[in-house]
From Swiss-Prot:
It catalyses: succinate + ATP + CoA = succinyl-CoA + ADP + phosphate; GTP + succinate + CoA = succinyl-CoA + GDP + phosphate. InterPro entries: ATP-grasp, ATP-grasp_succ-CoA_synth-type, ATP_grasp_subdomain_1, Succ-CoA_synthase_bsu_CS, SUCC_ACL_C, Succ_CoA_ligase-like_bsu, Succinyl-CoA_synth-like. Residues 9-253 form the ATP-grasp domain. Heterotetramer of two alpha and two beta subunits. Belongs to the succinate/malate CoA ligase beta subunit family. Its cofactor is Mg(2+). Keywords: ATP-binding, Ligase, Magnesium, Metal-binding, Nucleotide-binding, Tricarboxylic acid cycle. This is Succinate--CoA ligase [ADP-forming] subunit beta. Coiled coil: none annotated.
Amino acid sequence: MNIYEYQAMALLNERGVSVVPGYMAANVEEAVKAAEQLSSPPYVIKSQILAGGRGKGYFRESPKEGGGVRLVSDIAAVKKQAESMLGRHLVTAQTDDQGIPVEKLLITEAVSIAREFYLSLLVDRQTGRVTFVASPEGGMDIETVAKEKPEAIHRIAIDPATGFQPHHGRMIGFALGLSGDVFKQGIKLAASLYKAFTTSDMSLLEINPLVETNDGKLLPVDAKISFDDNALFRHPDIAALGEAGASDPLEQEARQAGLSYIKLDGSIGCMVNGAGLAMGTMDIIQLHGEMPANFLDVGGGASKEKVAAAFRIILSDPSVKGILVNIFGGIMRCDILAEGIIAAARELDITVPLVVRLEGNNVNEGKAALVSSGLPIITASDLGDAAQKIVAAIRQTA
């Protein structure tokens, strides 16, 4: 689960990390009020979308007016810029060419920057450890730095048996090139970030840029946080952040139903159990010349209610021209799942082509139930067969 920058900054502040003062605004009046609450101009207006590259982005409706992050000199300019940003679609290197609508802004104080750094924490799958990634060269061009100057990227893994220790903080300070009092601030900041990361079950905590101000303070100016969806049950307050800030109502509905759903740009809706199987299904759809419309994992113990919810979510996307169900019945019985598919197909009156591939526990009974249902459900013997059939079906109906 991802959250917006304004939520990330507030969460870090609650966990003892000093951040640049700022307030969220959902309309022009709130933007003006937010600026009035800050100490003094200049101000920074930051578009709140769940994508990076905002500073170098542009608004689809007004590509020459400026990017998604703007520096303004007074409150009158806050009002003018908020009017030109809210409700428009911000296009960045991480969005499609349609962009993402900006529904919220973060108004912050501007800081005088002496140096910019990059600092993040993530779960390193190769080492199985929480790892700091640090670079003395932060800011909007960090991707270029990583590509052209990999020696400027430093990784510090934390042994879970010992946790964060003072020497880790010193290693991070040296990696960033800090000195003097700012070095001490860096050690304290790293310890606070590690504690926030581990106690909140984060999967990514990225500070870019982390800045040293002209008056010698070390402050996060921007923060990106992702959480482990499987641990959200331990953090209802954090789960509420995702529900309040969800940019896609279908993703919010899926989360509430216990489903993992991500909307994509294709035309074939996918319903699969297991993330690995889901990715394999999406790959083979592309291999046969079409694109998946979504990633949807119903999990290992999908009930009839979950299956029905999954179909509702998939069919709510008008770009879906056909549906491929690919289920391996291990814990889940294929005959029970088939009953759920049949019930959902009847309840929702599915009119797009539906191909179902079942394998595993009680697979023969499941296939028999689908065939005898009287519904236009196309069964498949394996994943390749399923992909061929759904691609052929949507092209035939096009």
